[in-house]
């Protein structure tokens, strides 16, 4: 039978595994299953058809799309489908399918037909036999040929799979059939039983009956060579199995491989375990079973098949390794000479715990036991009954202990019996015989299982077979003595007739086996009441002779030298005792050796008594820790019997460490290809309370934001692909699985998808995974799903979601996903692979969802099974679907494998519209837009159920997308960021998703639905800008209408807006191109663009917001030549683009959204602000408002975002007075810009006036966002320059001015460092600054300047960068900045300039980079990490101030100047008033923030005054717009007030979500605090922590740096919502710069104020945190330890990383660095972009830097980027400002977009900032541009992830 089994089972498996390789038996002649013709016959045909079909496929593609995709798709498909070698993804997918498809359904097209006669009969009976091991006589039944099954080969195979061979062969005949009970978690017995009853190879097969088996057969491969058959079975250990090595480390058995080699002569098997350290196991500990021992049990028969592998496992949580001192077990060898007074000795034993007995205590033996018997105390508990005289037991049952009832008569005997310890075993006569041998009985008790002692329940463990004869000890059973009885499984009591002990001596370990012979109790003539039931003694059935007797073995380790006689006895008994699988003489470390046959009880009980049990002596020599191994017992072990074998493994004490925290994630497999997007699973370390761990399931799964829409939030059961060696420990708080599923960790902070949409959607999404949604959608239409099967859905380029589902009920129920996993692979390849299966039904089904949501089913002709499966052979529609499956389409494409009634594999290919439900991630809008663009017409958008009312966002997106190549637009936009890109497309044309977003956005932003939509659509960053824009527009137009009905009107509006935006985008594109060409005259260019934007804004008042958002995208395309460079910045600094046209502004938000919550919170606030400002601004945007909006946007986007950090103030002012301030700002729209510039610049002062609407943010930004803001300002500038290059030039001018202003402040501050380079920058910056900056910023600046000194470098660098950007925009500044960039930028400029691009693309990163500049500049000042703080504050503030201020002042100035000097002056006055207000607020905030430092900073930058003029000049263009803006501002103020309330409510929600996220990240946050966010950073970081976990730990060393880093992270993460992000980051940085208290207090106050006004601010920190959490989580191990690079820990380290990672991960790294090294990282990122600068910075820290890369592909749905998200985890050892060495681990998520795809627009957008930098620093430009593109893209993408 064993042979049969082995052969039978493998054969099917073999068929499955090697159906194509091995000769298959003739398939059943199923009518519906024709045999596939040989593939060869079709190969040529297929080859020919492949080309033709591909051509045909392309003919079906829209000409425009075809034009764009022809080459790419051809190459992609050819590459994907053409490569002969299966890729890792293919292998994984196919293996996954193989493993999850029913084992017997795989490759078995030749299954015997149902009509095929089946030999032999009752399969059920036979299977039952197998199950029960009751094959008494079947041992030799047809050993060689498979046992005929009742018909079902499957059943027979199942039998084999589920039964040990020896059971099958009837080896178990002597075993008594037992009813197996399911192993309860923690139930050692159950587990042991499990292993005992099942061979390992069977364990994996998961038959329905044996679900609990630890091993799951994943694959079985049979090789037949000659007569040698080698079967390799690969088992997936589910639940997790673990092996403990000699050191005590527990290793997960990732896979158990059983190699069976059978030949005529030999049949051998060996187990290979693929293990990995348990601490690397990211599995629920309750699922972990420790394989306590593997033993090969060889039957006596020569037949090898008699051997069985016994895996003894124990639930991990049940393992309580207790180091027991040997003294506890020391035998008291010569305790009492076997001599004279047995009774006295008996009393001794009775009164003392054995372990307390010493040989010298004979005299005092009668003394009461020294120690109290404490329950649970091992020593005292061990011998519980020893402590009482036996007589005390008389007539009463001792409940908790051995349940022993002394016989009424013979009690005296017992007491006299020296074996009082053994009362249970012998009766008085026995006592007399053994009179002097106390030790024997002592040993007996020592060997009693503790629970037998401790529990009164009768649990004899085996069913005793009675054996005739007296026990080997020859002790007669005394009837008068208490009768000890064993209870068998049937509950029968068997009196112990004799007890014998056999000693096994091996090594220095002595084992005793107690053999109890029993006699049925009823034969004792005594009532059971007098019986002590012995529990937990191993029964050895002696088959020989009378089966009626069973020997009970107590196997124990002698208390050392327990009596020679006993040893002899033992040796004697050895022959009789059942042979243990383990050698009787165990080598010292041999786990198998000592077999404690103590009965074990369920782990839950074990926990209580483990102490006692463990106390059993282990080998005296080394085993201090006892590993209890449950030795498998024969299956016959009755279920009821609790008898367990505890195997004590001797492990030298010290060696074994059991870490209970076994939840660790293994990094997503970095398969070298961007499959990094697979879900990260986080398991938190959980202290496992004893006994309850198994109940707890902590699984965290972060889904990339990109995958959010389709990825199931809940943990994927599937194991992480083998081969992923790196493990990360995720220090996420765990929460119950249920809550996880319910709310995806509520805030979704842990879910990367979080950024995608507000928490509400996220929570919903977590409840239904994409696969579930797909299945639900498919199942909703009858006829599609008819059977459980496997769902394969393309999640994105190179990634597949594989889900195994079953249909509940009769197939009518909803599909239930049993297992879902993301694997890397290409759907087309997998489909081709699947199609090659011989059992594929040729009649497939193609399910296509039309835009209306109707599923259209078409028959799908599948290639003949035997054919090559080339694409040409496929149905053209399937080909098209496959092409989409490559990730180029937004549609959800996939394949469903189901089984037909005939047993064939029915394939259903489906292409579903992106889900537009709230659950869908923003991507769906993008997808919709993308699909519309793919089709070349936007009509599909009309079909959306909701339409944004005149949603400009969609238009801009459309126009942006359309202005770009359709592909470019699509590709371009989505790659921006999973969030941003999605937001872009969404905002622009992918409004479908926005509805959800709107749903959230509306509440969040409290903006019109359109804004909401935009928010959703641009939710990432775009959402922010879009929402802001839309909110602004929506508010302006009709916030009410938009919020109420973001749905339909928005979409229509979006469509119209898209068209308008397309036209505008095209015109803008031309303008931008011209402007870019005009680069030297950016102002002119900017004017046209701004004018165009203004017009567009005026034209698309509504559209503009979207447009603003979109323009960023479109702008990028428009300004592709130059703006693309700039635009990427613009995108991140969307607000700049917003200036350009709200478009760019929105993308900033897009980046923010990655913060998810941040976006929402920030966005709401931003939106409020923006609604106030933006609403005001949108109008200004249309005219002067163009710039005003730009500023407003910038203000909202930048300053507003700046306000976010300080929003409490700024927003407080802005919120309460925000409308007024907004109006004022709008009124002073030019000033608004100016003010914004001023505000940010003089974050303390100007921000207030400007931030009357968003004063605090500027303050914080001024301080915190100094670096950020330069990033932001640069971003704004860049955005303006890039996003609205045409516009940008003016904006840039205006921004340049702000930058100049800021730079003057920052420059002056920074000038000392960057003087040579900075002066020029200063000048450009100065002009914008004076008007407002001088007024407002200087005060603020001054406060910041002190912190800024470090900040100077950053700020200067940033200002320089801004200048550089300005210079880029403004040729003159560009020159200087270039110089500066070249010179200082390497440190400051590069960071700033780079940061700019980064900030805009990964502006956050860049902003942090400026911080790095600060850090670098601060490197010089590196000694003062506090300065970094200051830097962060200040650079942030200056940058922020100058950036936004500069931009805004520029814009404001532009607007103002263009409007009129008077208007400008008036605006300035208003601004001044606002500034005064802001200053007042700022002072409050500044009280926390170093206002004086800012002031000093500003004062230090005397040139700030100079900036103002420039700003006015810049403002000139928007004169009329500004006035318009004012009028609109007034109106918008009202709308804003409304929106404010809405937003407030939304923000509260967001805040709540953020709080959840923060709480989720609380574990991280404390680290962040501990890490050295000593000041506020920890707090901010806590919020930022999630967003920038790295940030949190990144700047433990320097809060300033950290702030910078956070800023960087924020900025980068918020590249989309850079402004917001910057605002937040800056606020945070600012706050941090001020001091966490400032951040906390002002932020909190502001937040609360904002909350009152715009709730978001508070959320903002969370938001910051939140964004980082969802998309990517960087876990930072920030351990303060002296590091090599104490000086510039963050920056150098960051720089190095940046340098190293810059090219591919530059932005992400920037982000990461920003996050971690806030400052340093930003700089590095900047450096990344400009590696030259970074390396210097990096060089110091490299040595302390560790980098581990976790690659996540976050853009599953964004066809724009095939790139994967690369998560780089870097560890930096940095020295913080306080000299603490901080080990920072930063995880940078780099989204690598496919540069080839949309290098211009996509990369351009992202790279634009870099380009800007490069423009600033040409030297680095060309070389870094590519980096910049990739890096920036990565940044932008990763930023959302980071956030």
From Swiss-Prot:
| Phosphoserine sites (modified residues) | 205, 208, 213, 295, 332
Residue ranges with Low complexity bias: 415-429
Q: Report the locations given in the UniProt record.
A: Cell junction, Adherens junction; Cell junction, Desmosome
Q: Which GO terms describe its molecular function?
A: actin filament binding; RNA binding
Annotated spans, Interaction with VASP:
1-54
Bias (Polar residues) occurs at 1-10, 1064-1073, 1080-1089, 1294-1311, 1393-1424, 1588-1600, 1663-1679
Tell me the keywords, alphabetical order.
Actin-binding, Cell junction, Coiled coil, Phosphoprotein, Repeat
Q: Where is the composition biased (Basic and acidic residues)?
A: 564-577, 1357-1368
Q: Region labeled Interaction with FLNC — which residues?
A: 1685-1843
Q: What spans are recorded as compositionally biased (Pro residues)?
A: 23-39
Q: Which residues form a coiled coil?
A: 1462-1490
Q: What is its main location?
A: other
Q: Name one GO biological process term.
A: actin filament organization
Q: Where are the Xin repeats?
A: 89-104, 121-136, 151-166, 186-201, 226-241, 264-279, 302-317, 340-355, 376-391, 436-451, 507-522, 545-560, 589-604, 621-636, 654-669, 691-706, 723-738
Effect in UniProt of substituting residue 1634 to K = In a breast cancer sample; somatic mutation
Organ and tissue specificity:
Expressed in skeletal muscle at areas of Z-disk disruption in a longitudinal pattern spanning one or more sarcomeres (at protein level).
A GO CC annotation recorded here is: desmosome
Task: Please give the residue ranges the record annotates as the region Disordered.
Answer: 1-48, 132-151, 406-432, 455-479, 564-591, 943-999, 1063-1205, 1238-1277, 1289-1471, 1561-1696
Summarize the subunit comment.
Interacts (via N-terminus) with CTTN; the interaction promotes CTTN localization to intercalated disks in cardiomyocytes. Interacts with CTNNB1. Interacts with FLNC and VASP. Interacts with F-actin.
Quote the record's domain comment: Xin repeats bind F-actin.
The miscellaneous annotation reads: 'Xin' means 'heart' in Chinese.
According to its UniProt entry, the function of this protein is described as: Protects actin filaments from depolymerization. Required for correct cardiac intercalated disk ultrastructure via maintenance of cell-cell adhesion stability, and as a result maintains cardiac organ morphology, conductance and heart beat rhythm. Required for development of normal skeletal muscle morphology and muscle fiber type composition. Plays a role in regulating muscle satellite cell activation and survival, as a result promotes muscle fiber recovery from injury and fatigue.
Question: PANTHER family given for it?
Answer: XIN, XIN ACTIN-BINDING REPEAT-CONTAINING PROTEIN 1
Name the protein family.
Answer: Belongs to the Xin family.
The name under which this protein is listed is Xin actin-binding repeat-containing protein 1
Q: What is the organism field in this record?
A: Homo sapiens
Tell me the gene name: XIRP1
């Amino acid at each position: 039978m064993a042979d049969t089994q082995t052969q039978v089972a493998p054969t099917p498996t073999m068929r499955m595994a090697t159906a194509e390789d091995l000769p298959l038996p003739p398939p059943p002649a199923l009518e519906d299953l024709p045999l596939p013709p040989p593939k060869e016959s079709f190969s040529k045909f297929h080859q020919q058809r492949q080309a033709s079909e591909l051509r045909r496929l392309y003919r079906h593609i829209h000409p425009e799309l075809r034009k764009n995709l022809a080459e790419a798709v051809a190459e992609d498909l050819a590459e994907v489908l053409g490569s002969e070698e299966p890729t890792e993804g293919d292998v994984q997918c196919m293996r996954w399918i193989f493993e999850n498809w029913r084992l017997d359904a795989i490759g078995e097209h030749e299954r015997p037909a149902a009509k095929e006669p089946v030999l032999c009969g009752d399969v059920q009976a036979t299977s039952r036999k197998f199950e029960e091991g009751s094959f008494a006589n079947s041992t030799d039944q047809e050993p060689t040929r498979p046992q005929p099954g009742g018909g079902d080969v499957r059943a027979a195979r199942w039998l084999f799979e589920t039964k040990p061979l020896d059971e099958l062969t009837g080896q178990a005949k002597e075993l008594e059939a037992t009813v197996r009970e399911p192993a309860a978690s923690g139930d050692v017995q159950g587990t042991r039983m499990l292993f005992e009853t099942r061979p390992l190879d069977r364990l994996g097969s998961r038959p329905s009956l044996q679900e609990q088996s630890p091993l799951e057969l994943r694959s079985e491969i049979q090789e037949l060579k000659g007569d040698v058959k080698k079967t390799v079975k690969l088992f997936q250990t589910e639940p997790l199995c673990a092996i403990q090595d000699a050191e005590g480390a527990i290793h997960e058995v990732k896979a158990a491989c059983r190699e069976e080699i059978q030949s005529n002569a030999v049949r051998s098997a060996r187990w290979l375990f693929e293990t990995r350290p348990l601490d690397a196991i990211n599995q629920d500990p309750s699922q972990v079973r420790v394989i306590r021992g593997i033993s090969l049990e060889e039957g006596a028969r020569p037949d090898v098949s008699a051997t069985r592998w016994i895996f003894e496992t124990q639930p991990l949580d049940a393992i309580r390794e207790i180091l027991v001192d040997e003294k506890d077990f020391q035998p008291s060898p010569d305790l009492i000479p076997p001599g004279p007074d047995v009774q006295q000795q008996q009393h001794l034993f009775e009164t003392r715990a054995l372990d307390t007995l010493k040989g010298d205590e004979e005299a005092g033996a009668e003394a009461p036991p020294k120690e109290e018997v404490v329950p649970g105390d091992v020593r005292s508990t061990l011998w519980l009954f020893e402590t009482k005289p036996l007589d005390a037991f008389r007539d009463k049952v001792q409940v908790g202990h051995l349940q022993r009832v002394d016989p009424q008569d013979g009690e005296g005997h017992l007491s006299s019996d020296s074996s009082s310890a053994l009362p249970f075993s012998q009766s008085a006569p026995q006592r007399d015989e053994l009179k002097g041998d106390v030790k024997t009985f002592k040993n007996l008790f020592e060997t009693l299982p503790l629970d037998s002692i401790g529990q009164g329940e009768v649990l004899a463990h085996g069913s005793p077979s009675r054996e005739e004869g007296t026990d080997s000890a020859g002790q007669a059973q005394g009837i008068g003595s208490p009768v000890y009885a064993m209870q068998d499984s049937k509950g029968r009591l068997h009196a112990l007739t004799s007890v014998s002990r056999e000693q096994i001596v091996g090594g220095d370990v002595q084992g005793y086996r107690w053999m109890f012979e029993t006699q049925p109790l009823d034969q004792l003539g005594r009532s059971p009441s007098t019986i002590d039931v012995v529990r937990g003694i191993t029964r050895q059935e002696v088959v020989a002779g009378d089966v009626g007797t069973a020997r009970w073995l107590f196997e124990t380790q002698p208390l050392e030298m327990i009596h020679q006689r006993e040893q002899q006895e033992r040796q004697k008994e050895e022959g009789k005792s059942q042979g243990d699988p383990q050698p009787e003489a165990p080598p010292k470390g041999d786990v198998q050796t000592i077999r404690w046959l103590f009965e074990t009880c369920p782990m839950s009980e074990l926990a209580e008594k483990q102490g006692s049990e463990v106390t059993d002596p282990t080998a005296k020599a080394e085993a201090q820790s006892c590993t209890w191994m449950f030795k498998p017992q024969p299956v016959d072990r009755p279920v009821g019997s609790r008898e367990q074998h505890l195997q004590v493994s001797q492990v030298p004490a010290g060696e074994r460490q059991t870490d209970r925290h076994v939840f660790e994630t293994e990094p997503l497999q970095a398969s070298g290809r961007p499959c990094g997007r697979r879900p990260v699973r986080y398991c938190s370390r959980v202290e496992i309370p004893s006994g309850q761990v198994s109940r707890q399931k902590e699984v965290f799964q972060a889904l990339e934001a990109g995958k959010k829409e389709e990825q199931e939030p809940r943990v994927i059961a599937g194991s992480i692909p083998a081969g992923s060696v790196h493990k990360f420990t995720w220090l996420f708080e765990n929460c119950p699985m249920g809550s996880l599923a319910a709310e995806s960790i509520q805030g979704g902070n842990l879910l990367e998808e979080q950024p995608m949409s507000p928490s509400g959607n996220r929570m919903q999404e977590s409840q239904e995974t994409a696969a579930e949604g797909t299945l639900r959608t498919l199942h909703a239409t009858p006829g599609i799903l008819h059977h459980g099967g496997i769902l394969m859905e393309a999640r994105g380029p190179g990634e597949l979601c594989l889900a195994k589902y079953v249909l509940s009920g009769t197939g009518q129920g909803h599909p239930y996903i049993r297992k879902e996993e993301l694997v890397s692979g290409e759907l087309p390849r997998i489909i081709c692979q699947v199609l090659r299966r011989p059992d594929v039904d040729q009649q497939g089904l193609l399910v296509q969802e039309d835009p209306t949501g109707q599923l259209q089913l078409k028959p799908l002709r599948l290639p003949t099974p035997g054919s090559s499966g080339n694409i040409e052979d496929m149905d053209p529609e399937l080909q098209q679907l496959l092409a989409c499956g490559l990730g180029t389409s937004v549609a959800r494409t996939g394949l469903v494998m189901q089984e037909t009634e005939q047993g064939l594999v029915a394939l259903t290919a489906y292409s579903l519209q992106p889900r537009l439900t709230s659950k869908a991630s923003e991507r769906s809008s993008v997808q919709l837009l993308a699909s519309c663009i793919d089709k070349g017409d936007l009509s599909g958008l009309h079909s959306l159920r909701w339409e944004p009312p005149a949603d400009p966002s969609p238009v801009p997106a459309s126009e942006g997308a359309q202005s770009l190549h359709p592909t470019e637009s699509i590709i371009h936009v989505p790659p921006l960021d999973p969030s941003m890109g999605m937001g872009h497309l969404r905002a622009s044309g992918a409004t479908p998703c926005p509805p959800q977003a709107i749903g959230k956005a509306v509440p969040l932003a409290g903006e019109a639905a359109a804004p909401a939509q935009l928010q959703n659509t641009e939710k990432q960053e775009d959402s922010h800008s879009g929402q802001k824009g839309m909110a602004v527009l929506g508010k302006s137009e009709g916030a009410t209408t938009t919020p109420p009905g973001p749905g339909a009107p928005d979409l229509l509006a979006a469509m119209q807006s898209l068209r308008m935006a397309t036209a505008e985008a095209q015109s803008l594109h031309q303008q931008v191109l011209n402007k870019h060409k005009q680069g030297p005259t950016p102002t002119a260019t900017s004017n046209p663009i701004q004018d165009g934007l203004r017009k567009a804004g005026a034209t698309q008042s509504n559209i503009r917001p979207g447009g603003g958002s979109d323009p960023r995208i479109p702008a990028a395309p428009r300004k592709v030549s130059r703006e693309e460079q700039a635009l990427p910045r613009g995108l991140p600094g969307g607000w700049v683009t917003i200036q350009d046209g709200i478009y760019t502004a929105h993308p900033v938000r897009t980046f923010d959204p990655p913060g998810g919550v941040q976006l929402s919170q920030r966005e709401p606030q931003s939106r409020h602000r923006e609604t106030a400002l933006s609403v005001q601004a949108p109008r200004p945007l249309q005219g002067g408002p163009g710039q005003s909006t730009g500023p407003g946007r910038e203000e909202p986007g930048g300053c507003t975002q700046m306000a976010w950090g300080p929003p409490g103030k700024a927003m407080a002012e802005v919120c309460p007075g925000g409308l007024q301030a907004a109006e004022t700002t709008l009124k002073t729209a030019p000033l608004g810009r100016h003010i914004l510039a001023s505000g940010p610049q003089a974050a303390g002062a100007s921000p207030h006036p400007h931030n009357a609407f968003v004063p605090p943010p500027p303050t914080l930004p001024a301080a915190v966002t100094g670096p950020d803001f330069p990033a932001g300002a640069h971003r704004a500038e860049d955005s303006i320059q890039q996003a609205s290059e045409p516009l940008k030039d003016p904006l840039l001018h205006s921004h340049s001015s702000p930058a100049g202003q800021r730079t003057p402040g920052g420059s002056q501050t920074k000038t000392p460092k960057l003087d040579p380079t900075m002066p020029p920058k200063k000048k450009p910056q100065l002009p914008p600054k004076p008007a407002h900056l001088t007024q407002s910023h200087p005060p603020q600046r001054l406060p910041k300047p002190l912190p800024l000194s470090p900040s100077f470098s950053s700020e200067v660098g940033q200002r320089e960068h801004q200048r550089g950007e300005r210079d880029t925009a403004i040729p003159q500044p560009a020159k200087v900045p270039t110089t500066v960039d070249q010179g200082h930028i390497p440190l400051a400029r590069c960071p700033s300039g780079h940061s700019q691009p980064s900030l805009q693309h990964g502006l956050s990163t860049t902003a942090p980079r400026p911080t790095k500049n600060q850090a670098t500049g601060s490197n010089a000042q590196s000694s003062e990490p506090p300065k970094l703080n200051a830097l962060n504050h200040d650079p942030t503030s200056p940058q922020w101030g100058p950036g936004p201020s500069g931009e805004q002042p520029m814009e404001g100035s532009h607007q103002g100047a263009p409007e009129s000097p008077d208007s400008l002056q008036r605006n300035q006055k208003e601004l001044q008033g606002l500034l005064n207000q802001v200053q007042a607020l700022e002072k409050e905030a500044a009280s926390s923030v170093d206002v004086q430092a800012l002031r000093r900073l500003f004062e230090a930058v005397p040139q700030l005054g100079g900036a103002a003029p420039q700003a006015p000049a810049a403002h000139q263009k928007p004169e009329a717009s500004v006035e318009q803006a004012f009028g609109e501002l007034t109106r918008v103020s009202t709308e804003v007030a409304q929106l404010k309330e809405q937003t407030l409510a939304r923000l509260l929600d967001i805040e709540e979500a953020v709080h959840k996220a923060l709480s989720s990240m609380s574990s991280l946050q404390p680290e962040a605090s501990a890490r050295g966010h000593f000041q506020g950073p920890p707090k901010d970081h806590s919020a930022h922590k999630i967003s920038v976990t790295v940030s949190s730990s990144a700047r433990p060393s320097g809060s300033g740096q950290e702030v910078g880093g956070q800023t960087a992270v924020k900025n980068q993460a918020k590249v989309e919502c850079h402004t917001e992000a910057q605002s937040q980051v800056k606020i945070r940085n600012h706050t941090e710069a001020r001091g966490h208290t400032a951040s906390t207090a002002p932020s909190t106050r502001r937040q609360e104020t904002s909350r009152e006004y715009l709730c978001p601010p508070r959320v903002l920190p969370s938001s910051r945190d939140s964004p980082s959490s969802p998309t990517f989580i960087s876990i930072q191990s920030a351990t303060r330890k002296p590091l090599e690079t104490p000086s510039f820990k963050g920056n150098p380290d960051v720089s190095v990383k940046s340098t190293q990672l810059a090219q591919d991960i530059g932005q992400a790294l920037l982000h990461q660095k920003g996050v971690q090294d806030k400052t340093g990282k930003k700089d590095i990122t900047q450096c990344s972009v400009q590696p030259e600068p970074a390396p210097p910075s990096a060089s110091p820290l490299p040595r302390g830097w560790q980098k581990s890369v976790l690659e996540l592909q976050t853009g599953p749905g964004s066809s724009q980027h095939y790139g994967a998200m690369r998560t780089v985890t870097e560890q930096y050892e940095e020295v913080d400002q306080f000299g603490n060495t901080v080990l920072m681990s930063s995880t940078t998520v780099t989204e690598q977009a496919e540069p080839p795809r949309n290098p211009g627009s996509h990369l351009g957008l992202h790279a634009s900032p870099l380009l800007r930098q490069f423009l600033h620093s040409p030297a680095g430009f060309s070389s870094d541009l590519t980096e910049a593109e990739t890096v920036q893209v990565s940044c932008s993408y990763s930023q959302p992830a980071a956030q």
